[in-house]
């Protein structure tokens, strides 16, 4: 469970722990990870939780995380790609990628691929990726994915990263056909979390103005929990909202863009053969 120290991720991790799952909680701050693990153990009888730390702004750290997970756990039944970020000003990751593309798409793309063999060996298994309805305003400019030649628009860049989540899920599901591993993604709703805290003044204002109509993290986690654990989920490659499969924006059904994004992502993350 990535990005599980607060908000939707924490609520999802706690719900799954209360259902009896062994939950591995990821965060970028060791103190926060430890605190959440202790709090979940206190709130959930016989909860089996532990933590791992990695910075998704560094692909080297993502690779280290994948090795640590594989070393510590013989089985991996569910991978929830929840970690995400928003920023209103352009800045690079440690690898030089646009911040939101790097953390919201390339990091989970790499982590998922590095853990695929463990997931296949644990089949039936599930991959759940948190996207957003914001993908509807996203445009993937393959000639300028890092926003080096355009005026930066943080919300559009966020939307592009969430569109990438859906395209990634679609191609991943196709590649996993017959493996016993499913891949689905979701819109959690507009949730009252701290995701806008690192988005600059403009982003924080957007978050504050929208907070009155936002869902609680527990409510926002419902679709993630459903896709991770419900026996009713028997599909793959779908986009969910409120625990139901729905049609994403037309751009999310672009087969050529789906294939191209996969190829580009393989190259950028060093997975290309």
Q: Residue ranges of each PLM-predicted region?
A:
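A glycine/serine/threonine-rich, flexible loop-to-helix segment
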Residues: 143-145, 192-210
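Short, well-ordered loop/turn and helix-capping segments at boundaries between secondary-structure elements
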Residues: 125, 201, 230-233
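Intracellular terminal tails of multi-pass secondary transporters
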Residues: 259, 266-273
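Rossmann-fold NAD(P)H-dependent dehydrogenase/reductase core
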Residues: 1-194, 270-272
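Extended hydrophobic/aromatic segments used for targeting, binding, or gating
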Residues: 32-35, 53, 205-206, 210-216
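A non-catalytic, amphipathic alpha-helix used as a structural packing/dimerization or gating element
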Residues: 32-35, 260, 264
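C-terminal helical subdomain
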Residues: 161, 185, 207-248, 253-259, ...
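A short, mixed-charge helix-start or loop-turn motif at secondary-structure junctions
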Residues: 2, 150, 154, 206-210, ...
């Amino acid at each position: 469970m990535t990005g599980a120290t607060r908000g939707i991720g924490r609520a999802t991790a706690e719900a799954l722990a209360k259902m009896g799952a062994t939950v591995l909680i990821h965060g970028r701050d060791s103190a926060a990870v430890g605190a959440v693990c202790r709090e979940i153990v206190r709130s959930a009888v016989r909860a089996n939780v532990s933590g791992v730390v990695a910075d998704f702004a560094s692909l080297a750290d993502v690779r280290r995380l994948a090795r640590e997970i594989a070393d510590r756990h013989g089985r991996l039944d569910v991978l929830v790609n929840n970690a995400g970020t928003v920023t209103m000003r352009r800045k690079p990751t440690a690898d030089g990628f646009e911040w939101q593309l790097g953390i919201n798409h390339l990091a989970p793309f790499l982590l998922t691929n590095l853990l695929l063999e463990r997931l296949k060996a644990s089949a039936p298994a599930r991959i759940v990726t948190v996207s957003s309805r914001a993908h509807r305003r996203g445009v993937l400019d393959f000639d300028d994915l890092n926003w080096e030649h355009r005026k930066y628009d943080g919300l559009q860049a966020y939307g592009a990263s969430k569109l990438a989540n859906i395209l990634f899920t679609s191609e991943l599901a196709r590649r996993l056909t017959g493996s016993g591993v499913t891949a689905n993604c979701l819109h959690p709703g507009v949730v009252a979390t701290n995701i806008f805290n690192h988005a600059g003044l403009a982003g924080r204002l957007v978050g504050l103005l929208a907070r009155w109509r936002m869902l609680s993290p527990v409510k926002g986690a419902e679709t993630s929990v459903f896709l991770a654990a419900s026996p009713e989920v028997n599909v793959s490659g779908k986009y969910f909202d409120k625990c139901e499969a729905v049609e994403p924006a037309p751009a999310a059904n672009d087969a050529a863009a789906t294939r191209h994004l996969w190829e580009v992502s393989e190259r950028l993350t060093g997975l290309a053969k």
